[in-house]
Each structure stands twice: as structure tokens, then as C-alpha cells.
Amino acid sequence: MEPLAVVENYLEAFRRRDFEAARACLADRGFEYISPIASFDDADVFISGMDGVGAILHRLETRLRFVEGNDVCHVLDITVSMDGYQTSRLVQLARVKGDRIVRLEAIFDASDFHRMIGDPSLG
């Protein structure tokens, strides 16, 4: 399967909140996830953590995608429902090996999250 198809399958499963199907897109060994607020080196633990996001996910829209070899980049708008709807821009970088995602990196402005959990450095 082409890298873009693997990552698109993962995102579609995430949109449907089908975390079992999303997990099937991730490598069993050597998986890595990095974001401004979390990091995981175990796909099962990562998917368990995504349940919370799924509970508040309202919409996930792809604005742009491109592929370079085994690397796939998506620019996404993610809308969550927390005290009303909030939409944030997120860049997801994925590396595919074989038919599985071995690395995900999410790049986004985490200042709202840090304010929500009471990070005093953000005023």
C-alpha cells in the first residue's frame, strides 16, 4: 500500500472514532508519536490516549497534503467541542514503513491547552 493511502486510512478511522481501525494502521514495534503536549513510544498506549480526543472531536478537515517518499504531511483543521466549538490548525507528519505508520509528529500551537490546564507561564 502506498504511504499516502496508509495515512489517509488512519485519518479516516480517526474521523470515524474507529480507534481499532486507526490502531491497525500503526506499527506494532518501533512506533513513535511526538507533539507539543505528549509523546509515546507504544502504539497501544497512544491509541488509548486518543480516546479522549475522540470524545471531543467534532470535525477533522484536510486542507493540504503532500508526499515525499515514505513521508506524508497533512495540514489539518481540527474542530473540538469544549465550551463551544474551537478550530485549530495542525500539521501532521507521518513516516510509513511497509504498510504501517512508524512515526507521527503533530505540530500545533499548544498555548490554549496549557492555559486550560493552568500553566502559570502563559498568564
What are these regions (language model features)?
Residues 1-123:
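C-terminal and inter-domain tail/linker signature
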